[in-house]
Amino acid sequence: MYTQFMISKKNGKSRIISAPNKKLRNIQRKLAYVLSLMYKPKVCAYGFIDKKDIIGNASNHLRKKEILNIDLKDFFYQIHIGRIIGMLEKKPYCVGHEAAVTIAQLCCYNGKVPQGAPTSPIISNMI
């Protein structure tokens, strides 16, 4: 259901991409849309948020004495299926257990959120 390949990062290292096949990708796109209707981002959130970008985020930090910029290693892969199920079952989402499990299974590859799936950005923001 997934094809894995490597891409180069700016620092010269590689990143593993796990791309879903066409059928699963279409399902995930629709699911990502439904999840986006449920998710209300915090004002401070900028990653993967419509009409927000790196320029807008950076403008919040103009004239600051210090700025910390970090890149979390394997960020999506740190989110496992159990966290997704738990998040969906609790407030504010309150999704039933069976539905939460099904959604989580559709969003995960080998029990984790893959880099390359259409659902990964919204799931990471919801978590």
For the regions a protein language model found, what residue spans apply to each?
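Active-site-proximal segment of RNA-dependent polymerases
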Residues: 24-70, 74, 114, 118-125
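Conserved polymerase palm-domain catalytic core
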Residues: 60-127
